UniProtKB/Swiss-Prot annotation:
Full protein name: Succinate--CoA ligase [ADP-forming] subunit beta
Record-listed ATP binding positions: K46, G53, R54, G55, E99, T102, E107
NCBIfam families: PRK00696.1, sucCoAbeta
Encoding gene per record: sucC
Pathway in which this enzyme or protein is active: Carbohydrate metabolism; tricarboxylic acid cycle; succinate from succinyl-CoA (ligase route): step 1/1
GO MF annotations in UniProt: ATP binding; magnesium ion binding; succinate-CoA ligase (ADP-forming) activity; succinate-CoA ligase (GDP-forming) activity
GO biological process: succinyl-CoA metabolic process; tricarboxylic acid cycle
Amino acid sequence: MNLHEYQAKQLFARYGLPAPTGYACTTPREAEEAASKIGSGPWVVKCQVHAGGRGKAGGVKVVSNKEDIRAFAENWLGKKLVTYQTDAQGQPVHQILVEAATDIDKELYLGAVVDRGTRRVVFMASTEGGVEIEKVAEETPELIHKAAIDPLVGPQPYQGRELAFKLGLSGKQVAQFTKIFMGLATLFLERDLALVEINPLVITKQGDLICLDGKLGADGNALFRQPELREMRDPSQEDSREAHAAQWELNYVALDGNIGCMVNGAGLAMGTMDIVKLHGGSPANFLDVGGGATKERVTEAFKIILSDDKVKAVFVNIFGGIVRCDLIADGIIGAVAEVGVSVPVVVRLEGNNAELGAKKLADSGLNIIAATSLTGAAQQVVAAAGDK
């Protein structure tokens, strides 16, 4: 789960990380009032969306008078910002962050992720701030310096100092960087984060370090113990179908194809998508109904899949282990009857009560194509979608 920049900076403040004075505003009037609270200009106004590339898309602007702040807010609030990280529709802008402008001398990068290879939180720092760290890693990997956090002892100040020296910092900047490093590491661990980025971490003309931007990603599996982060969730920044799926504990990811997929188990779901592609089709989604599938959840899964206008056929692939195939069949029959499915539905059932499930589908009188093998099912659904 991603957080907005203004939310990240609110958390930064609690952990002692320096950031420009700023206010998140939902109306043009609030934006003007925020500028008055901050003091004399210039100011920076930023659209708050869960996407990078805002500056190039016109979503970040330096302004010198309050009239320009109002104009910026009026132009963007309620609109959608399209960047290279969004889809063609863009992300809705509901808040504008108004901040004091910062005199920048140099831009750095500081971030952290969970490294599955080392099974540790790994911090990354670079002198190449203000640009995509992925690009730096690809073109000049030697400019990225790392520090792995030992889970037994936690972050250590010496690690921050080592990174500071590698970045060419000296004097008070080393102490400032070490404080930022320790605060950020504590924030990462205490809040169960999966990603944190300060890009850029700037050195001002006065020689001080400031967190000019902030990006936080929370581990969705740990949100049950992070109630404050759960409250920060902004569903408007998420795909509406994915948000709906989450309410029913369905794992759904929208894709660009035309064959809807409903599968139980993440591994089987990925394998199903692979075999659809292998036979010339294009999956419209990843959808895992999980091991505790019920008739109601299957019905909702159908509704979510069919809410995508691109879907020309639906492939239901169920291996009955924990979940019984006859219950899935009941859900499919109920969903097809309730939703009024007008596209072909190919169903492959294997495992627990598969024969009973297949009989229920056959006796339903509905236009459901039964498949006995995975390969055959893939070929049938691709043909039904008109891809071959």
